[in-house]
Amino acid sequence: MTDDMHKTENFPPDWLLVESLDLEAQGVAHRADGKVVFIKGALPFELVSANVHRKKNNWEQGVVTAIHRESSQRVQPGCPHFGLHEGACGGCKMQHLHVGAQVAVKQRVLEDNLWHLGKVKADTILRPIEGPAWGYRYRARLSVRYVRKKGELLIGFHERKSGYVADMKECPVLPPHVSDLLLPLRALISAMEAMETCPQIELACGDSVTALVLRHMEPLTHGDLALLRGFAAQHAGVQWWLQPNGPETAHLLDEGGQALSYDLPEFGIHMPFKPTDFTQVNPHINRVLVSRALRLLDAKRHERVIDWFCGLGNFTLPIATQAREVLGVEGSEALVARSRQNFKLNQALAPVNKSLAATNFVARNLFEMTPELLIQDGAADKWLVDPPREGAVSLVQALAELHQQKLDPIGHPPIVGAVGWMPPKRIVYVSCNPSTLARDADLLVHQAGYRCSFAGVVNMFPHTAHVESMAVFDLEV
């Protein structure tokens, strides 16, 4: 904000006019001398006072102490554990902002990142994908800690900017049946001999089963195992998993029972998974996300599609209902094996007149891709790319190198197999980090011969500052 804009507002010099929110959901303001001030708890267009607790040459950071002019988008938080008070939960950052305004903030973050970091502007902004604002979080990692000074055990997320566990009795972003388990879980773990050696419970909800993965540092006694079994018997749909070491050691307490799974009914896909597998936190949004991604991909029955970072096949299997041939590429051999199992299961379940396309899966280190490896996986008409937060820079860099070699074969070393290899005419990129999306978009648009046709946000995590998004890149003819 310029000095002139400050002068148009007649307010005391120590008051701050908030202009926007940053990626941590802090209000961003400027002092009259241009210094940036980040203010926790402040919203855009509010006039506030702040207690500054950190100062640098070019910026300051503080906490709002008074709101002199309130935003029309400020709302009452839906959770008693949210806020700036001591002991407040750090799981959510934006409950004080109307959910529609949260989406607008995330859309601005996406567009700002694309332009300022990648010098890319989408031809068309997609309508945001939105869903339920509460009860959406079907995956969570809850910390468990016995506090000797208080003589009590706590289960919940960490406190805001702290390693301490918040004293949570409920959590409205969890499904109600899971939120209702928080206090019973406290009582359960408090009664166990292993109370002080169980640091974490990871939860994963399927369509009909809730898996609780108990991380335990020491072997559990017969008495503790009996308590876990009794808890599961009292709470319908609860399934205990035990994890003595890393995620790969997680196993069912008792074999049998219903498998953890979710469905993508639009495509007739059934997806079994383990609680330690990566699946989307928000199943409601995931269904809409897959549907939109496939509409944008627009795979035809004569086309070959590659799904990079395919995981368990969340996109791969729906694509197989539309394309001629699909290749799923993933970094983990174990995940590739599981993807193959999921494909075989769905192939067996599919009606004769709706059989899945020929689908293969390969393991590949997607953070060390080369043009030669890209060629080895074969040309495809279209790509779907769904990377982790680190993005897909190695993949798109390899694509850019092939494009540059084609444009200037004399100025670039020859690439074995490049002759006859064709780049995908469309790429649908699903991102969980707008800054790495912008970096990869820069490569695709300015070095690989694509334009950004569409971009938009996906509100996968309401009330948090996490920005999920989707962009479509089309090859320039």
UniProtKB/Swiss-Prot annotation:
**Protein's organism:** Albidiferax ferrireducens (strain ATCC BAA-621 / DSM 15236 / T118) (Rhodoferax ferrireducens)
Binding site residues for [4Fe-4S] cluster: C79, C89, C92, C171
- Domain TRAM spans what residues? 7-66
Q: What is this protein called?
A: 23S rRNA (uracil(1939)-C(5))-methyltransferase RlmD
* NCBIfam families noted in UniProt: PRK13168.1, rumA
Q: What does this protein do?
A: Catalyzes the formation of 5-methyl-uridine at position 1939 (m5U1939) in 23S rRNA.
Extract the InterPro entries matched here. 23S_rRNA_MeTrfase_RlmD, MeTrfase_TrmA_CS, NA-bd_OB-fold, SAM-dependent_MTases_sf, U5_MeTrfase_fam
Transferase as UniProt keyword? yes
